[in-house]
């Protein structure tokens, strides 16, 4: 048991910065996508309907916390179903002060189990990291990390806008080898400008260097100040298959931080 020496007031609660490494969170879906709590579930996105196969429920949970292997180091949160997603929408109330903060950024720490740079089991599978999102209607902005048929040792990254659950590209596409162990993914919205960066300290292979893949990614797009101005949610959506042993195609998440400003 833990005790605090005095009653907790609204001033004691930091509402503009949220961080978790997932290890002590209950990994289940909350009815009604409740605000102020982390919501873990699985759903098939609309743009995956042409996938030849889709892994049905292989386990009883959409997410697991623990150790796997290959490129995923240590312990962390990883997918238990294809289409696994995380949604978080903060509680907004005048006494909390969050309703006046329209800008937002997120930093995600990720280790793909795939260690060659391709990130996912098959072409077309992707990870979306979205901010300024209505997590019910799925309207917002983000970064897509996707494996394509063109590369077996790299992924493509580009900015997206979600409109009622349908994603569309809103930036140039960058082919990169940085989606490997130790990948850091940063997405930011500030005054109508969406930007994203991705990088890693893992060195590229000789072949990756010869092929000229970007070692890191920086993307920017103007999205306007009015559209999605009231949205404050985070969406992380992984459409990759699980692979053998139910983890060899997964991506381990070690931590996420959200800042409102």
Language model: regions and residue ranges:
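Short, aromatic/His-centered strand-loop micro-motif at the edge of beta-sheets
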Residues: 161-186
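Ligand-recognition surfaces built from glycine- and aromatic
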Residues: 2-9, 22, 215-261
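Secretory/extracellular carbohydrate-interaction modules
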Residues: 77-158
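Extracellular glycan-recognition surfaces and repeat-rich motifs
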Residues: 26-84
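Carbohydrate-binding surfaces in secreted/extracellular proteins
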Residues: 106-108, 179-221
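Hydrophobic residues embedded in beta-strands of well-ordered beta-sheets
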Residues: 61, 72-78, 152-157, 167, ...
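Predominantly extracellular/luminal cell-surface or secreted proteins
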Residues: 5, 130-134, 160-162, 197-201, ...
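Generic beta-strand structural signal
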Residues: 65, 69-72, 147, 162, ...
